[in-house]
UniProtKB/Swiss-Prot annotation:
Gene3D superfamilies the UniProt entry points to: Insulin-like
Species this protein is from: Xenopus laevis (African clawed frog)
Protein name listed in UniProt: Insulin-like growth factor 3.L
Gene this chain is encoded by: igf3.L
GO cellular component terms attached to this protein's record: extracellular region; extracellular space
Location of the protein in the cell: Secreted
């Protein structure tokens, strides 16, 4: 077999090999929009899912939250737990409860500090 015939046969084999490759089709824009909208919807639903009970109408955030806590707790004051990492908390923080989900007076009262007691067990009066 002559060399030119071998080269022609090899080139035909290469052309066939090139033709058998799968073509990568571009991802259609409509599918990309659909996927992104699904991801966004899942994100929104996940953020709403952190409210385990139905949302109340009143959302309290920032200075409004502090003012209402001072009003409800009175002279005993209030506390916000510190140092607990997000994963180790057994209950959401006051901001998650009242600012994102809305909270009731009972939840606000649960953040009031306990009255200061002296060693006789009687409640001290603050002036």
């Amino acid at each position: 077999m002559p060399v030119t015939a071998m080269c022609l046969q090899d080139s035909k084999k290469l052309k066939k090999a090139k033709l058998t490759r799968k073509k990568v089709t571009p991802f259609p824009f409509s599918r990309m929009v659909l996927c992104l909208s699904l991801v966004f919807t899942l994100y929104v639903e996940a953020t709403n899912a952190r409210c385990l009970r139905p949302r109340s109408k009143e959302l309290l955030c920032g200075s409004e939250l502090v003012d209402i806590l001072q009003f409800i707790c009175g002279p005993t004051g209030f506390y916000v737990s510190k140092g607990a990492s997000f994963r180790n908390r057994n209950r959401p923080g006051i901001v998650e409860e009242c600012c994102f989900c809305g909270c009731s007076v009972a939840i606000l009262e649960s953040y009031c500090a306990a009255p200061v007691t002296n060693f006789t067990g009687r409640e001290e009066q603050k002036s």
